[in-house]
Amino acid sequence: MPFDLDSLKYNEAGLVPAIVQDAGTGAVLMMAYMNREALEKTLATGETWFWSRSRKAFWHKGETSGNVQRVKEVLYDCDRDTLLVKVEQHGAACHEGYYSCFHYRLERDGSVTVVGEKQFDPEQVYGKR
């Protein structure tokens, strides 16, 4: 039975949060936003597409870095307001060069520990920002 993408509960900007998870390990890689068209592109191509709120443009994950995400499964929650995209991650997911965007651990004493190691140098991939 076909799913009506309009039945998802997009926010006032027409976006829905998309949590991206490594399909093999279960690690949470990142969170970004999709609009209806980004979700359509994701389903059609089998790779993740998102909507950049700051640039007001589509972005294909890995387009610049080559670190693409091959979609294995897309799930939505019971409220229909959040997506879970399970992927096979190629390279690092984070634009800071880490495998996961969740590489800052907030300690109980309020300090921050960086977990994981950089897999690439962002300046070499993206240039100076």
UniProtKB/Swiss-Prot annotation:
The keyword Cytoplasm appears for this protein: yes
Entry GO CC: cytoplasm
Amino acids binding Zn(2+): C78, C94, C101
UniProt-annotated binding residues for Mg(2+): D77, D79, D81
Cofactor (UniProt): Mg(2+); Zn(2+)
Transmembrane residue ranges: none
Entry's cofactor comment: Binds 1 Mg(2+) ion per subunit. Binds 1 zinc ion per subunit.
GO molecular function: magnesium ion binding; phosphoribosyl-AMP cyclohydrolase activity; zinc ion binding
Reactions the enzyme catalyzes: 1-(5-phospho-beta-D-ribosyl)-5'-AMP + H2O = 1-(5-phospho-beta-D-ribosyl)-5-[(5-phospho-beta-D-ribosylamino)methylideneamino]imidazole-4-carboxamide
Sorted UniProt keywords: Amino-acid biosynthesis, Cytoplasm, Histidine biosynthesis, Hydrolase, Magnesium, Metal-binding, Zinc
Enzyme class: hydrolase
Cellular location(s): Cytoplasm
EC number from the UniProt entry: 3.5.4.19
UniProt-listed InterPro entries: PRA-CH, PRib_AMP_CycHydrolase_dom, PRib_AMP_CycHydrolase_sf
One GO BP: L-histidine biosynthetic process
Pathway: Amino-acid biosynthesis; L-histidine biosynthesis; L-histidine from 5-phospho-alpha-D-ribose 1-diphosphate: step 3/9
Role of this protein: Catalyzes the hydrolysis of the adenine ring of phosphoribosyl-AMP.
Entry similarity comment: Belongs to the PRA-CH family.
NCBIfam families registered for this protein in UniProt: PRK00051.1
Subunit structure: Homodimer.
Protein name per the record: Phosphoribosyl-AMP cyclohydrolase
UniProt source species: Pelotomaculum thermopropionicum (strain DSM 13744 / JCM 10971 / SI)
Encoding gene (name): hisI
